[in-house]
């Protein structure tokens, strides 16, 4: 994948519209988590040092095309100033005369944050006139937000038809890391897919069996794969209406010479709650009243042995109900094993998705993986093999 970056453009004195993702959690008008802001530091500091006039575009929350004060980006200003060690001006709108006046006042190296682009319905509709109003205040455009690049929105895709467009450093780093995962990986490649439902990851599973050497299935979706092979799963979460679909995925994996790895033993609980009574069972012995809530000890050993032989690991989704101890043990054990191999340079590990990030933080290994994507929907669509609208616009002709 070849795309245009900041190395390909002179930004001195240029009005640079930068699409960032400042969709951060807030409480009582204060930012609660700075993680997403920090991810943009490299791009913003570089542009500032190179003498660009920075105009930042972002959404926050889901205001549905109207002004909702609780979704204002104003609280971001003071936090961002500390992160980039630079004053940040704020415009109470993202288009119109107020913004134009603020942009005209910018000097080289200045930073201006515009108000939430989703206060206008034209943003999510990818309206060309709204995209034009955004583009009016810039000479060129930089996308630094992989997490929104699956959205064909005005500030992500529409604007790229109107201005020369480039990838920022955060986006560039993410794309290069993901390329190591599935684009041009070192083999053998293992994908570990967990989570509750097969239905939410059908496209992911169908794509992965074509791309990886081993596909490990965990979490609630493993129950559907077990059931499709005639294994009784008791009261476990299971999508019985998808049995034929699951069988087709199993068949496709065989045709693509992709090894499918399912649990061989499981932790069964008898109530769906923290510290519920539980026992370890082989998959052929699951009691009628039981629910599969985690993978068992032999399954952990099997998965870790597959990871030992892998050069690349792509992970999305927990292996059990990790938010309810003690049913987090499987996820923690495998995560720590993968992290240890990553730290010693024996494994390239790429992980992403909201629950996955939470699970790896819970296991205290999030910083030990080769790359951890905080993008949710964008990461899943990448795993499906889709070319994201916001990325397509940056690719070299």
Curated annotation (Swiss-Prot):
Tell me the subunit arrangement. Answer: Monomer.
Which reaction is the catalytic activity of this chain?
Answer: (2R)-3-phosphoglycerate + ATP = (2R)-3-phospho-glyceroyl phosphate + ADP
Annotated transmembrane regions: none
Q: Name one GO biological process term.
A: glycolytic process
Q: What's one GO MF term for it?
A: phosphoglycerate kinase activity
State its location(s): Cytoplasm
* Record key words, sorted: ATP-binding, Cytoplasm, Glycolysis, Kinase, Nucleotide-binding, Transferase
Known EC number = 2.7.2.3
Q: Kindly list the positions annotated as binding ATP.
A: 201, 323, 353-356
Q: What name is this protein filed under? A: Phosphoglycerate kinase
Protein family membership: Belongs to the phosphoglycerate kinase family.
Q: What is the lineage of its organism?
A: Bacteria, Pseudomonadati, Pseudomonadota, Alphaproteobacteria, Hyphomicrobiales
PROSITE patterns under this entry? PGLYCERATE_KINASE (PS00111)
Q: If you read the UniProt record, what top EC class would you report for this enzyme, in one word?
A: transferase
What pathway annotation does it carry?
Answer: Carbohydrate degradation; glycolysis; pyruvate from D-glyceraldehyde 3-phosphate: step 2/5
- Which source organism does the UniProt entry give? Bartonella tribocorum (strain CIP 105476 / IBS 506)
Where does this protein hold substrate?
A: 21-23, 36, 59-62, 118, 151
